[in-house]
Amino acid sequence: MIFSSIKNGDSFEKYPAAIQTALEYLKSHDFASMEPGVYEIQGKDIYAQVFDAMTEDVADRRPESHEKYLDVQFLVSGRERLGFTKNTGNYKVAEYIKERDLIFYESVEDEGYIESRPGCFCVFFPSDIHRPQVISGEA
């Protein structure tokens, strides 16, 4: 897992090429003015999915992971908590949606949380389970 902010001005050269490409796309596009939908960056290999979503209570958000794709979460506005833990292979799968490369889990253990603000990004690898769109701990 990688957590940082586009606003930090960090060089993306330290990351693999696919992550560099995704982060440069985040940095160079105004997501607030984009319509929800899928935007191809490098065909089906690298793409952005724009959502207009509200955060929910942690109990209403399912932990998830992906087998094929990395998942780069980027917050445009508001606040969000992201849950995360390592995929030990011991968690019971609740639902597998192969065409979306999406695995939902019934529950996970040792889940940590990070607070995300506008401009923050988090890269989740197939070895990471994550729980996006959780209501922030701040009022």
Model region roles, listed by residue range:
Residues 68, 106-111:
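Short alpha-helix capping/helix-loop boundary micro-motifs
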Residues 57, 137-139:
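Short, intrinsically disordered, charge-balanced linker/junction segments flanking boundaries
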Residues 72, 121-123, 139:
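A short hydrophobic beta-strand segment most commonly corresponding to one strand
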Residues 114-135:
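Conserved metal-binding segment of the jelly-roll/cupin
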Residues 36-57, 68-76:
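A short glycine-rich, His/Asp/Glu-containing loop-to-beta-strand
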Residues 68-70, 74-84, 89, 97-102:
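Glycine- and acidic-residue-biased ligand/ion/polar-headgroup-sensing regions
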Residues 63-66:
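Short loop/turn motifs at secondary-structure junctions and domain boundaries
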